[in-house]
Amino acid sequence: MAIKHLPKILIARKNKAEVNHCDLKRRVSIKIIYGLGNPGSAFVKSRHSLGKLMVSMYADSMAFPKNWPSTKENLTLVLSTSYMNDSGKQLKKISNDFVRKVSPLDKIVYVVVHDELELDLGKVKLRLPGGSHRGHNGIRSCQEFLGKESFYRIGLGIGRCESRNREDVSDYVLSKFNSNEMKLIETDIFHKFCNILQQLQLSIET
């Protein structure tokens, strides 16, 4: 998916009279990739923590430092350490920290990686800033704390259970992937995720 324009909120602007050629050369795009998931070993490889798992896999494949948040060049990877309903608080704190550190000319782009019930397992979709949280409490929290138009999303399909009962759905999203599903995640789904992330990064830089 080609992204032609970045939302205005993601671009740090400055009066034209204040911008010279040296300023333009110093402008940097800083990307923060935030993987959603619940904390603790009980939720490792659970459907609702697929975003966190995917970002962790990406860090390993790209030889990122083992400390979190993990930074390599202008890309920072973050794993959620809070429960899903409070995901936005951590993202807001990270945002505040980066805003204090970077130049006013730099643009900070946020990408939230999360599981998505509305997509079948194996589907990966880039969503532009804005739009509904689609009932995802982690996305709802991020929108509340950072703003609805402030971040891209990469949705990772986990499919729906047959039942629409709230308790059944909760049990389903907290259940763990089986071995066949994990093979799919580690191959096809991870490959799709990397391709979408690469396309997004290229679009941000142009």
Curated annotation (Swiss-Prot):
Catalytic activity: an N-acyl-L-alpha-aminoacyl-tRNA + H2O = an N-acyl-L-amino acid + a tRNA + H(+)
Function: Peptidyl-tRNA hydrolase involved in the recycling of tRNA-Lys from diacetyl-lysyl-tRNA-Lys and is important for mitochondrial function.
UniProt subcellular location: Mitochondrion
Single annotated GO MF: peptidyl-tRNA hydrolase activity
Enzyme Commission numbers on file: 3.1.1.29
Record key words, sorted: Hydrolase, Mitochondrion, RNA-binding, tRNA-binding
Residues under site feature: Stabilizes the basic form of H active site to accept a proton: D115
Organism phylogeny: Eukaryota, Fungi, Dikarya, Ascomycota, Taphrinomycotina
Gene that this polypeptide is encoded by: pth1
Any single GO CC term annotated in Swiss-Prot or TrEMBL for this entry: mitochondrial matrix
Taxonomy, superkingdom: Eukaryota
NCBIfam families: pth
InterPro entries: Pept_tRNA_hydro (IPR001328), Pept_tRNA_hydro_CS (IPR018171), Pept_tRNA_hydro_sf (IPR036416)
Gene3D superfamilies associated with the record: Peptidyl-tRNA hydrolase (3.40.50.1470)
Record protein name field: Probable peptidyl-tRNA hydrolase
Provenance organism: Schizosaccharomyces pombe (strain 972 / ATCC 24843)
Transmembrane annotation, as ranges: none
One Gene Ontology term from the biological process aspect of the record: mitochondrial translation
Sequence similarity: Belongs to the PTH family.
Location of the active site: H48
Binding of tRNA, residues: Y83, N85, N137
